[in-house]
Curated annotation (Swiss-Prot):
Protein name as annotated: Triosephosphate isomerase
InterPro entries, sorted: Aldolase_TIM, TIM_sf, TrioseP_Isoase_bac/euk, Triosephosphate_isomerase, Triosephosphate_isomerase_AS
Alphabetically ordered keywords of this record: Cytoplasm, Gluconeogenesis, Glycolysis, Isomerase
Pathway named in the protein's UniProt entry: Carbohydrate biosynthesis; gluconeogenesis; Carbohydrate degradation; glycolysis; D-glyceraldehyde 3-phosphate from glycerone phosphate: step 1/1
GO molecular-function term, one example from the UniProt record: triose-phosphate isomerase activity
Catalytic reactions of this protein: D-glyceraldehyde 3-phosphate = dihydroxyacetone phosphate
Described function: Involved in the gluconeogenesis. Catalyzes stereospecifically the conversion of dihydroxyacetone phosphate (DHAP) to D-glyceraldehyde-3-phosphate (G3P).
UniProt xrefs under Gene3D superfamilies: Aldolase class I (3.20.20.70)
Cleavable signal peptide: none
Active site (UniProt): H98 (electrophile), E168 (proton acceptor)
Gene (UniProt): tpiA
Domain of life of the source: Bacteria
PROSITE patterns given in the database record: TIM_1 (PS00171), TIM_2 (PS51440)
Length: 251
């Protein structure tokens, strides 16, 4: 944790959730008041549920976000969704550059940067994801990979108000594996140094989230690490009890 930076616990539902999932979201809304003093809460459901969830969340302690956007505001892009459309549906933040988008759809740093700028254009926060693969880690390339992703994916003009960085080691996502606390501290410290060097005072205030098999049993330990300002939670965010328990793990 970093003094004076309010933690953010963001849930990425990925390609999960139908109308019936509103019951879990309702439970999150009902329990949010108990953790509101510890952290901000954000849930990013599939695009099909954003409007319904945003309506439910109005005036409550849980914000609603999106998992991706197209860089353009409109046009002949069948199946894509503009940041403006997501904001219009009620999203207040958009995840961009998630490793699954980078791997499954071949998204590179330049496109991720454009998507972050699109989020800003729509008046919402960009959550930019970075992370190394197992092969890159084994080759000792972690910091070089992260430096390249940070340099290429973060737009000029990034501030603590419009951008969040999420570090997700690709090898830890959905595997049950997590880096050691020492590894997390080293990498988040490296990210903080990069952000402060490039964005000065704002870089020192930006939230840096940890993601990758975050669960109630390890949340408190991870959230206590210096320069960890919250979590990007995958599978555990699908259950209200787990999601809220992770938030309770914040100092």
């Amino acid at each position: 944790m970093t003094d004076a930076i309010r933690p953010l616990i963001a849930g990425n539902w990925k390609m999960n959730g139908l109308k019936a999932s509103a019951a879990e979201f309702d439970a999150m809304l009902n329990g949010a008041a108990d953790v509101a003093t510890k952290a901000d809460l954000l849930v990013c459901p599939p695009a099909t549920l954003i409007a319904a969830f945003a309506d439910k969340a109005r005036g409550k302690k849980v914000a609603v976000g999106a998992q991706d956007c197209h860089p353009k505001a409109s046009g002949a892009h069948t199946g894509d969704i503009a940041a403006e459309m997501l904001a219009n549906a009620g999203a207040t933040a958009i995840i961009v550059g998630h490793s699954e988008r980078r791997a499954d759809h071949g998204e590179g740093d330049a496109l991720v940067r454009q998507k972050a700028e699109a989020a800003w254009r729509a008046g919402v926060t960009a959550i930019v994801c970075i992370g190394e693969t197992q092969a890159q880690r084994d080759a000792g390339q972690t910091l070089d990979i992260l430096r390249g992703q940070l340099d290429g994916s973060l737009p000029d003009g990034s501030t603590a108000a419009n951008l969040v960085v999420a570090y997700e080691p690709v090898w830890a996502i959905g595997t049950g594996l997590t880096p050691t606390v020492q590894d997390v501290e080293q990498i988040h410290g490296f990210i903080r140094e990069f952000l402060t060097s490039r964005f000065s005072v704002d870089g020192a205030k930006m939230r840096i989230l940890y993601g990758g098999s975050v669960k109630p049993s390890n949340a408190a330990e991870l959230m206590a690490v210096k320069n960890v300002n919250g979590a990007l939670v995958g599978g555990a965010s699908l259950k209200a009890a787990d999601f809220l328990a992770i938030a309770k793990g914040c100092p």
